[in-house]
């Protein structure tokens, strides 16, 4: 058992001493046998999950296979080997994913589980115990959960059979710890899965027959003249769904860059005797509603269908087949597609990517197992769907079949392509022109403002020390920003409940960075815990005499509306009105902008973001935390902090002592109450 690429197949081969397991990722359980060290060994390899994806994000078929795996070696396995790579850091997200998937088997499975570390050769002279102690608490939690049973395997060194003999001994010890018993799953859980699987397979067969008949009926109504010499296609879907790869597969060459684009891309090519135009629209976050997406993204989705005039023959809605599709994804997808009007669904085909992960499983089995949200989507699209394996470009039959399905879609629409309401398109184009004009003006204003400030600054005003507080909602990118500023991994990416202080030398300055804990993005200050509010107030006192700037962190790839603005305003107001004069808005995820200027994003996003920038004296900066080697973005940020100090007559921010004393007093009182409660508990227990 384990995540993808952990080394399950290689481990199975090492145990059996020969190549029995295919190194391709299986979609179903694989069973193999062999004689090892005078024992008959049966090994079941369960399919793996994506390492950082919670169990809720995994497809239903995968979850069923995990449950079924322990029934394939009756009466049950003597041990479950939980495979983890020793050369990869084990993070909280990995622990949560692993825990969720193993919990499908019930709580008792942990008593029969051994953690098996692969890539043991990477340890060199380091012992596995040293590695475990050097890792954070998540790995230690896992080992505690498994009764501290673990083993290291070097799959590259097959000749060393002592490591396999020792592993088999540890499995026997595990059985002894369980009073000689193997693991047995609750029969009720297993029976339910088997019954559900049978029903799904029946429905999948019926679906295959229905789809075949539907296609035959459409083809019989089409004449030879309805074979198109030109096809216009729009690719739509969430980020990382595989839009660019699909575009490249359709055109048969690398035309689309696999980087996420902020704007629509248009490419052409000759495919199967047709001139094909493909438009790739930028994607949204898979479980973010349309209200949470930036306005620029929504504008691009609307524009996409106008870039292949007179309109696309089909919209291909891209979904990964190796990731679960639930209500959140369905709502996000529905909201974004509805921007194009209700009529777009008549021209839409669902295109499943990562088809290679299905192997011997039919797409119909996947659909029937996944549940009502995916079925709703297919019904909405007139049950038009196709599976693509973007890794197998040489198989051009999958593309020919897709183009035929697009022609069938046109036939279902009486020979018509999709055309967006001209009024909607015209209004959007006019709005975009006005935004671009305002963006140009803003850029000039900001440039002039900075030049004026710099002209007032003398060389003596270049500060040798800078004190910075990072403030913002959870997942905004505060820790990553702190690491980018200091040029190294100083802040843990886990959410912290308390302020964290770090120091470093950057661009000939001594920098102190305080990271304050974040609030929930849409939650007003009244709903935040008192401890969080206290930490926000205390943050500015942790770099005495006070910070030169407060960096207010906001993600540029997420919409900023009234709820976010109110939450942010409420939390920052805890520090008093004067804090706004020392605040700079720092946009993270700058890489998602690409060729779009930050000014265009600001002008398109609307009044709430503009209110915030006005409140901060129009001080802002964009950071791409993925590009650490570009130190110009950090140097420019430090210059903007110095300019902020100049705007404040050389003064740093200092919180009203009364606010600080009140907060400090409340914190001390809470600590005293907690101590009293602890004392009472200890006396009661005695």
State what each model feature region is:
Residues 84-85, 319-320, 554-555:
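Glycine-rich, N-terminal phosphate-binding loop of Rossmann-like dinucleotide-binding domains
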Residues 1-43, 48-61, 72-76, 89-114, ...:
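C-terminal non-catalytic interaction/localization modules
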